[in-house]
UniProtKB/Swiss-Prot annotation:
InterPro entries assigned to the protein according to its UniProt record, in alphabetical order: ATPase_dom (IPR011579), MJ1010-like_2nd (IPR049081), P-loop_NTPase (IPR027417), WH-like_DNA-bd_sf (IPR036388)
Single GO MF descriptor: ATP binding
Regions annotated as coiled coil: none
Keywords, sorted A to Z: ATP-binding, Nucleotide-binding, Plasmid
The protein's name: Uncharacterized ATP-binding protein MJECL15
PANTHER family found in the cross-reference section: ATPASE DOMAIN-CONTAINING PROTEIN, DNA-BINDING PROTEIN-RELATED
Organism the protein comes from: Methanocaldococcus jannaschii (strain ATCC 43067 / DSM 2661 / JAL-1 / JCM 10045 / NBRC 100440) (Methanococcus jannaschii)
Pfam families per record: ATPase_2, MJ1010-like_2nd
Lineage: Archaea, Methanobacteriati, Methanobacteriota, Methanomada group, Methanococci
Family membership noted in the UniProt record: Belongs to the archaeal ATPase family.
Residues at which ATP binds: G29, P30, L31, N32, S33, G34, K35, S36
Length: 365
């Protein structure tokens, strides 16, 4: 599927890249709102490759239980290299990256950070591994800057390392943040973007005083109604499907502006033809999920009070968005963790993760 819209967010990111690095940027939003698709579009189609080199670290599909797993995710080992001095290797890697895009073009979104095997093995022989890791990345990025290339470091689903500690006490996440602040705000060596669908994690970051002045946020929300209807036209043309204005209004009334759901509905429409049936099926699936969750709560799931959950959900019968203070902290955290509600920490508001969830709440209650 061709990329659609998001020009506002794309232009914001491109303007950030034109300036000297000064912040860690958190790209966040509801589930399936298009965060990864957005950064993919920027990196693959909008980026001036003569100026930038993207590095992409994907925590989404990795089981990261300790610092060793983190390092394995961070680096790609050059098994053929016998170079023991990381500075020598970093210089040669920087030369390779600057001379041509052949090495980069192998990677769809951005390359991992390559290290020579002797250096990688030496890291794992030490108790405190983070110092060597950070020193190598800093040196590599400094060399790229010297050659006129600005690195872009992207972390997908960074919250996956939230609980990992260094040597049993200090959190890896805060060690990493200190390093990233040094790379951006202090040394201006690289741009950093962190993607996350976990709004509790974003709230956690947002509330940390030590990060203020060193981080900023980009919200990738579901489409507004006008954009959602245009997206339906865009897809209908691609899929050679005739959608009436009534059809589009009906789709929006069920799934709102969530691009993934709109896409799923229109793709199914090619085979099923019955739009109302498709939408009702999706809604019933969501309602069943909510009903199952409430049944577990009624049986004392995680010590959550059933009546308090019901009262919280009832607040959304006539409201799509509410101040987070309207719902007790314990209850809202539970509903956010269960992907029923989405928290916007910048506005201090809560809303259902999607129109589909909102409709399921209203239908159940």
């Amino acid at each position: 599927m061709k990329f659609f819209n998001r020009e506002k967010e794309i232009n914001e990111i491109l303007l950030i890249l034109e300036e000297e690095p000064n912040n860690i940027y958190f790209i966040y939003g509801p589930l399936n709102s298009g965060k990864s698709t957005l950064i993919r579009e920027v990196i693959t189609n909008r980026l001036d490759k003569s100026k930038y080199i993207p590095f992409f670290i994907d925590f989404r599909t990795r089981n990261i239980l300790n610092v060793d797993n983190f390092i394995e995710c961070l680096f790609e080992v050059d098994e053929k290299s016998k170079i023991d001095d990381f500075r020598e290797y970093a210089k040669s890697l920087a030369d390779l990256l600057v001379k041509g895009s052949e090495e980069i073009s192998k990677y769809y979104l951005g390359m991992p950070i390559k290290v020579p095997k002797p250096f990688f093995d030496r890291i794992f022989s030490k108790r405190d591994k983070s110092a060597d890791v950070y020193q190598y990345i800093e040196y590599l990025f400094a060399k790229l800057n010297e050659k006129g290339k600005k690195p872009i470091l992207i972390f997908d689903e960074l919250q996956m390392i939230r609980e990992i500690t260094l040597n049993g006490n200090r959190l890896l996440l805060w060690s990493l943040f200190q390093f990233l602040v040094a790379l951006t705000k202090v040394q201006h060596l690289c741009h950093v973007f962190c993607l996350s669908s976990d709004s509790l994690f974003i709230e956690y970051i947002y509330g940390k005083a030590e990060l203020k002045g060193g981080v900023d946020y980009i919200l990738v929300d579901d489409f507004d109604k006008k954009t959602a209807l245009k997206f339906m036209d865009f897809l209908a043309k691609q899929k050679n499907i005739n959608l009436t204005n009534e059809d589009k209004e009906l789709i929006y009334s069920y799934v709102g502006g969530k691009a993934k759901y709109i896409y799923d509905v229109i793709v199914k429409l090619k085979a099923v033809k019955d739009l109302k049936y498709i939408l009702e099926t999706k809604l019933e699936e969501e309602r069943n999920h909510l009903e199952e969750l409430l049944e577990k709560v009624e049986e004392d799931y995680e010590g959550i009070n059933y009546d308090e959950v019901l009262e919280a959900l009832k607040l959304f019968k006539d409201n799509y968005e509410l101040p987070k203070s309207k719902i007790k902290r314990k209850i809202r955290i539970f509903l956010i963790k269960e992907n029923i509600l989405f928290l916007n920490p910048q506005k201090g508001t809560l809303k259902p993760q999607s129109y589909l969830v909102w409709n399921a709440i209203k239908r159940m209650l």
